[in-house]
Every structure is written in structure tokens, then in C-alpha cells.
Amino acid sequence: MSLSKEVKSFQWTQALRRELQSFTSDVKAAVIKDATNLLNGLDFSEVSNVQRIMRKEKRDDKDLQRLRSLNQTVHSLVDLKSTSKKNVLKVGRLSAEELMSLAADLEKLKAKIMRSERPQASGVYMGNLTTQQLDQRSQILQIVGMRKPQQGASGVVRVWDVKDSSLLNNQFGTMPSLTMACMAKQSQTPLNDVVQALTDLGLLYTVKYPNLNDLERLKDKHPVLGVITEQQSSINISGYNFSLGAAVKAGAALLDGGNMLESILIKPSNSEDLLKAVLGAKRKLNMFVSDQVGDRNPYENILYKVCLSGEGWPYIACRTSIVGRAWENTTIDLTSEKPAVNSPRPAPGAAGPPQVGLSYSQTMLLKDLMGGIDPNAPTWIDIEGRFNDPVEIAIFQPQNGQFIHFYREPVDQKQFKQDSKYSHGMDLADLFNAQPGLTSSVIGALPQGMVLSCQGSDDIRKLLDSQNRKDIKLIDVEMTREASREYEDKVWDKYGWLCKMHTGIVRDKKKKEITPHCALMDCIIFESASKARLPDLKTVHNILPHDLIFRGPNVVTL
């Protein structure tokens, strides 16, 4: 590794402390107050149970609910909290160059974190596998002659088998007040002794990163430090573990001075100045987001924490109420607010979707994804909306279970509302973030001379012709309405989870409630009707990723 790409961790920490000293404050009294409240208010038998859960090799939804419930109790007992607040950064206090640098680093950090949560190396998988998949993997490893992962070794696999992995977000951070309360109660040590011990650890942290050897030497003076242990894996360490990192953070928060990063307070009024200072430190020491998967370096750490929440103490506060990740909670708007000359601002809702197509990177991504379409496989197409104003398009290949399914914000909102009542039942508000330009890009990328099946071809033919795709051939199966809808309920029962956009009540001309029309469901319904049976799909997936289908209008989401 070249010197220019060497992470000089403590040197970076010291530089960040110098640059951000005006954003730090004395939080010692507040931390001790919160620790006292936790000592008096927490059920430590439940704390012990959660610590046991965090030692399990496989954890499920019940375990997660137990952790989240205890976290909620902690949240209700403390004053130091970070709140969920979206932060939109525009050119102004931060220059366009600084915003672009910030955007690039957040994107790199996102990629690094996602890789660390789902690494490919055998035996170090950190994502969500079901119990059945884990057992099956063990059998496969034995078949191919690979050893079963050592359960007690470093890099132990601990997996959350949960239905909604987003509920794991922001549930594992350490808090000085919680660390102190657990140390005092569970080691039967007075809180004042814990404060003194951690303060000494914090003083050491002003000149170096404390390690286990330092800890061993300090134990003679402070026996309570004996509860601190080395964590073999940093995967999902909770606030209830006695890790060295948690203890060092607590020590830093207890110092009256030292300009410790742990005492930074971020507010809407100072967030841009704080980020500007962070970027200033980055430039001075050539800090960067490392490609290496693992613990975050000091620059990555402060970047993530500050962008996660727009209000609160990013290092030491309770953040379990925050929704989303750093790249979701910080958005960058690089558009100019200066109106065009002689161009009156349109009334809200009157101009339709923003006239912005795909970016170059999105176009290249779509081109790669569309390469997975089999041009010779039987393929269905269906649309919702008008041919000149479609709001939903689906292309489905039953042989391999793959499909293209996306949405479009309508131009004619009055017509959309009529169609919603009598056909698709979609909510206009749900389409505001649909990616503009996707319809033309997808249709333009379909293989040359492809043959598509449909039930009713007039609107689809007009849509294809409007995109100069007269080479694409249509086969209209021309079933009766009754025959075409025969498998409607069965398809919705089995595959309805694939689309959650049809939320309204739909009535026919006789004002009788009917099932909303979904372009994707209709493709599967027509396939079922034509074969007189439900398709047996081993796998089913949309080749378009969610962040290509949706985006914030005029805003780049990081």
C-alpha cells in the first residue's frame, strides 16, 4: 500500500479533533445523569437476557423484538438522544465541489458497508440466511470436502434470520451512559468508581488508542475494568456488550476537555459548517474512504455518524429511533434555484413529472441488466394507464421467472384519478418518486425483433410505435374477459406480494368492487389462463433494482 493510501488512524483522529473543536462541549454531567437513570430504571435481568441473545449463533425475529423492546426502554430513560431528521444539502455554505466530494465518499462508504454486511468469503457471511439455508450450506461444505466453520474461532458466524432486515438498522450502537450503567450494576461496583476508571481510559485516549495491554495495566488501579473483553467479531455488537471500543468511547465522553469527537453536538443550524470542517480535515491529511472491508477508519466513522442524523450527539446519544442509513438520511441537491428567464413557475401538479432522463451510469446499468432478457423466450407485456401516458409497465418471462416491472408519474393527473377508480387503484403520491425516462429507456433496450404476447394489443402497439419500436411484434391472445380473468384470485393469492402499489378501491361500471388491475399480475394471470394452470415459478425476480425504479425528484439520494 502506498503512503498516500495509508490510513494513519490516530493522526486522522487528532486532526479531526482540532478541526471540529468548536462543535464539542462538556457532556460529562449529562452522561452521568443518563447512566444514573438507567441504573435506577432498567430491568437488568432483561439486560442479561439480551446479552445472552447476542451470544447466540442464530437469532430470529423474537430475539430482535426483545432487543428492540429493551432499546426502546433505554431510549425513554435517557436525555441524550439523536433524532431522525432528513438533511438536504444545497450549494451555499458548502460549494458544489465539496458537495460532489461528499456525495462520492458517501457512495463509496455505502458500497463498503454493504460489502461488509454480505462478504463473499466462506465462513464469514454476515447477512441473513434462514436456518434451512444454513443447514443446507453445512451439508454442501461437507460434500465438497470443506471443513465446517469453527464456532469458537475468530470471525464466528452470527446470523439474524429475520423477515425484515431493515429493523436491524441503528439497534446496535454503544452508548457511554449504558456502558457505565451495565458496568456498575453487573460488576457490583459503585458508579463513581466506574466513572474514575473510564476517565483514566479516556485520558489515555487523548494520546493513543488504548489496547488490551493498556487495559491489563490499568486493572490494578481500577479492578472494574476487568469486565471489559476483546470482541472476536464486531458484527452486531450491541450497546450491552463490554467491548474495549465501548469503554474508550465512554471514557472520552467523561473528559472535561480534550476536544473529543465523542462530545460533538450536531444541529440543523450547524450541520453544514460541521461537514465543511470535516472535509477541510480530509483535504489537509488526504483522508479517504478505504476499499478494505472491516471497521471504519476515523474519517468514515464521522462521515457516517454525522450524515445519519441531522440532530443530536452522533457518537454518544441513543439513536435507536433513527430510521434509515446515512446515505438515505442525507441528500444532496445540486440543482440551481435560479428560475429560467421568461419561464413562469408551473402550478403544483400541473406540469407532470420532471423532464429528466437516466444518468449515464444508470443508462449503462440498465443496458447491462437488459442483456439478461432472453429474446427467444415466451414473453408477456401489459401496461396500466394510456398508451401516451402509461403509469405501470410489466414484461414477464414465465420460463425463467424474471420480469421487468416499473412505474411512471402521469402527466394527466385528472385522467389518472379516473383510471384509479375504475382500473388500477394506484395512489398518485406513490408515483412522485418514480424514475423519469425509464419507459423510453427500457423499451429502447428491448432486443431487436422481439415477440411479445398480450391481451388486447391496441394501446401496447401505439406505445411501442411512439418509441420507434415497430420491429417488435405483438401476439394478441384475444381471450374473452371472463376467460382472461379466470386465474385472477389464485395469482393474487400466490404472487400478490410482488407489487404493493395497488392500494385503492376499484369498482366496475355497475359500482361493484373488483380486484385492481396490476400490469405484472395481469401478465401472470394471462399466462395462467392461456395454459389453464398457474405457472410453477422456481424463482421470480425483477431485473430492475429498486433504486433504479424510484428516486427523489430533482434530488440525488446517496
UniProtKB/Swiss-Prot annotation:
GO terms for molecular function: hydrolase activity; metal ion binding; RNA binding. It comes from the Viruses. Its main location: virion. The gene is N. Residues 54-237 are annotated as: Binding site for the cap structure m7GTP. The lineage of its organism: Viruses, Riboviria, Orthornavirae, Negarnaviricota, Polyploviricotina. One of its GO terms (cellular component) is helical viral capsid. Changing D382A: Decreases interaction with host IKBKE, defective to inhibit IKBKE kinase activity and IRF3 activation. This is Nucleoprotein.
